[in-house]
Amino acid sequence: MTHSAFRSGLLLALLIGVPFAVGSSPPPPDALLKTMQRELERATRSLGKSDPAPYFLSYAAEDRDAVTIVAVNGSLVASESARRRQADVMLRVGTPGLDNTHGASRPSGITSGMLPLENNPDATAHVLWQLTNREYEQAAGAFLRVKTNEAVRSQEEDQSPDFSQEAAKIELGGTVLPFSLDQKAWEDRLRRISAGFLKYPDVYTSLVLLQGGTARSYLATSEGAAIVEPSTIVRLVIEGETRADDGMDLLRVETFQAASASQLPSESELMAKVDKIGTDLKALRSAPPADPYIGPALLSGRAAAVFFHEVLGHRLEGHRQRDEREGQTFTKKVNQQVLPSFLTVVDDPTLQELSGVKLAGHYDFDDEGVPAERVEAVENGVLKNFLMSRMPITNFNHSNGHGRRQAGLMPTGRQGNLIVTSTNTVKDSELRARFIEEIKKQAKPYGLYFEDIQGGFTLTTRALPQAFQVIPVMVWRVYADGRPDELVRGVDIVGTPLLSLNNIILTGDTEQVFNGVCGAESGQVPVAAVAPAMLFSEIEVQKRAKGTQRPPLLPPPGLKTAPSPTHTADPGGVGR
């Protein structure tokens, strides 16, 4: 089963899995690379005499120090830094036409291990030698099985090679400005911000998390590629959770991303977000559960962005077009209409920010050493391209810089910054009026406005329904007769892609950004999705699964008296 999830910093574990670095000054960027290149050359010469001989060998390394500060209810629960160096050895035996990574044997192409923290050439080379030997044995055995399977199984429909030929790039990276973080000051700041949840006794679980620094990724290949890519990033997450009387867990999360800690929102702005989360959760606890519904719906820009990431984006990933276990929804629809003609979809990892918001899916080179490219996937509703790694598919023979992975896993075609634009727009202030017109036109008592979204997932394999599920958190019934909007809870957007994507009839004129972490076969990678608010003629929702545990019987100890704030719509919101 292919299961792809898109989350916005919901769990500490997710954030720790994203590469960051800080602390002591990193070693010169060429020192580790030179050791990798020397051992790569030695291994290539030696293994070239083996049978079967490798035709490709690469060493990748990631050097990072992670600084993480977590505060809960006014007190620190973690403030730590940890240095880590990991190496991945990727090796292919056979030929580019057929090698050990073919089909289900793809994991045989990689072996991983930890590198010494010190820049000791001998110790580093020894680890690479061990990993290379282990990987060669794994790859050679897998290639034998691949050849056996080819002889006894029916011919595959897509006869593309297993590996594309790409120009080897040399890029030793620019100089990253030293990462500056006053850890003591941020510890105090997170204490104060997290203490804001004490005013909300119904928020049973909360945290404020800061993580950031600089990282260096290294790649050396037998083709001659040599890449050192530095990066700097900071993330701050505010999370609160409560439970309704019927056992339904309710979560609200706000995530902020910047190039430096100084670019994060001010303390007063972050305190306001805590109050917003606390107020929202209080309102959600008393909101009625939603009923199954099919009818008009309005999605905010953030909600529409996640919708497109799940429903369209994963089905544009190149490897899904040749894997015969996949549903291949769009494989044979190139140059056909797949979206309304007013919509265009690009994936552009070269963009660092949009409208002043840093995009999480930015990178200069993908994890196979191919320069990132802007890919126009859908032009005026017509499918034009897929997101390609170095795994070719029919009529798409080369990578377009979208081979991505989490350390320890083989790369596949993945999304970076997925951006949806529209030529059929109205002012956001007018979109609500058009929404109500559509509700009346269909003689529905109400429509649903999806204000904010938590994440989602999609199923892409043939063995399961070609379906998706998007998980909203702030959903409103908008009544056609003018009654006040009503907050509801426990609703998920569900459906199938081909039908749902063509129910869009109008969009707003302001794009919104959703930054998150996406999980698929090649692991968790940071991504962004961008879209305007969208009006759908029809969307289907279902009731969300809930637990059976009641809220805590014992009141929380010693919390401040909670205020009774009144929920108001966000200024500039399109739905209310």
Model-identified regions with their sequence ranges:
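Short linear motifs in exposed loops
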Residues: 230, 387, 487-489
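Bacterial N-terminal signal peptides that target proteins for export
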Residues: 1-10
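Active-site bordering "gate/hinge" segments
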Residues: 20-365, 370-374, 379-382, 395, ...
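Hydrophobic alpha-helical bundle architecture
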Residues: 361, 421-499, 515-522
